[in-house]
């Protein structure tokens, strides 16, 4: 018997990442090749944005995806989020010229407060929320704090792009396929401060750290390359990474819903105090997923270099949180 359709909301649906994301969701890449979906697409209530969204929906129709059971366009989160199973919060205020980081934080705080409140009222209480729009960890924190009736654990931020970037850098360094690498971790904020950590990683069952055996490469090449990869893409392409971000969002939700078969992945999730990260901070941690739930990998040894990096990215998150505290009622 055919499965009942799942409802997926995507915000910023006519944007660059949205355009790379929607066709893959409708093709079954997000929730499985046997799972029909209904897309509930949110854009700002601006005539140009709504018109662009109508054009994207025309293209989605023209693909005649067997799994696309329906789609609707919205300018209000209260209708866009009605009865949804999954929310991909992609739309965020980009940083404009001359804009201070604190201005960016407060502009996004307004967006994510409104969206969190709407999720709280109209979404399913089991909704799985992924924030892609930057600053992703703090935006996820704002949405979580604005939705007290939805479990905090349902709010996540996207660290999977950093995770995938780190995987490919290691695969290139070792001249091996990415699929052979397991147990990579990316700690912290989705920003250049995040800490990709391959101390536990294996390739074909052998230690990646022992295979590379180069602390200087780790510190001076690997970590900065992963941290600055987004900027390098803007420099090369003139536009920010959209297809790779959409791909990471698909990976994140796909694994959360359908499981990782014991493989470690990185998700930005609310801390419960693990690894001395204060409770409620949405921080990149290693997890495995099964039966629609993620479970943190606990008890990993944190050496001095790692603790320093983990604290550095934590401090940035705490600073961002402090910058929006007054905006959260």
Curated annotation (Swiss-Prot):
Signal peptide residue numbers: none
> If you read the UniProt record, what top EC class would you report for this enzyme, in one word?
oxidoreductase
The entry's NAD(+)-binding residues are 12-18, 108, 115, 132-134
UniProt record, GO biological process: malate metabolic process; tricarboxylic acid cycle
Checking Gene3D superfamilies in the record gives:
Lactate dehydrogenase/glycoside hydrolase, family 4, C-terminal, NAD(P)-binding Rossmann-like Domain
Q: What is its EC number?
A: 1.1.1.37
Q: Which reaction does it catalyse?
A: (S)-malate + NAD(+) = oxaloacetate + NADH + H(+)
Domain of life of the native organism: Bacteria
| A Pfam family | Ldh_1_N
Catalytic residues, chain numbering: 190
| Record key words, sorted | NAD, Oxidoreductase, Tricarboxylic acid cycle
A single GO molecular-function term is:
L-malate dehydrogenase (NAD+) activity
The residues that hold substrate are 95, 101, 134, 165
Q: What does this protein do?
A: Catalyzes the reversible oxidation of malate to oxaloacetate.
Q: Which family does it belong to?
A: Belongs to the LDH/MDH superfamily. MDH type 2 family.
- How is this protein named in the record? Malate dehydrogenase
| Gene name, Swiss-Prot/TrEMBL | mdh
């Amino acid at each position: 018997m055919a499965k009942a359709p799942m409802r997926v909301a995507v915000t910023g649906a006519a944007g660059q990442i949205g355009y790379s994301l929607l066709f893959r969701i409708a093709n079954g890449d997000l929730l499985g090749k046997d799972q029909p979906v209904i897309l509930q697409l949110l854009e700002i209530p601006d005539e140009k944005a709504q018109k662009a969204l109508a054009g994207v929906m025309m293209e989605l129709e023209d693909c005649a995806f067997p799994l696309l059971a329906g789609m609707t366009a919205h300018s209000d989160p209260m209708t866009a989020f009605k009865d949804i199973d999954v929310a991909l919060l992609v739309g965020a205020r980009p940083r404009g010229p001359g804009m201070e980081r604190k201005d960016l934080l407060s502009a996004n705080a307004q967006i994510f407060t409104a969206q969190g409140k709407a999720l709280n009222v109209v979404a399913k209480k089991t909704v799985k929320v992924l924030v892609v729009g930057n600053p992703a960890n703090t935006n996820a924190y704002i949405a979580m704090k604005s939705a007290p009736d939805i479990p905090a654990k349902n709010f996540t931020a996207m660290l999977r792009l950093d995770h995938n970037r780190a995987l490919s850098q290691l695969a290139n360094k070792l001249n091996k396929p990415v699929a052979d690498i397991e147990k990579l971790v990316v700690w912290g904020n989705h920003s250049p401060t995040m800490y990709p950590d391959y101390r536990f990683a294996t390739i074909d069952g052998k230690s990646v750290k022992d295979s590379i055996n180069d602390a200087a490469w780790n510190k001076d090449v690997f970590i900065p390359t992963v941290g600055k990869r987004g900027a390098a893409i803007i420099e090369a392409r003139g536009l920010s990474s959209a297809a790779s971000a959409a791909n990471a969002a698909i990976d994140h939700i796909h694994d959360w819903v359908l499981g990782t078969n014991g493989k470690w992945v990185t998700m930005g999730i609310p801390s419960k105090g693990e690894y001395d990260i204060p409770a409620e901070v949405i921080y990149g941690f290693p997890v495995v997923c099964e039966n629609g739930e993620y479970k943190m990998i606990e008890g990993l040894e944190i050496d001095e270099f790692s603790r320093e990096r983990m604290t550095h990215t934590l401090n940035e998150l705490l600073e961002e949180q402090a910058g929006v505290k007054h905006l959260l009622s």
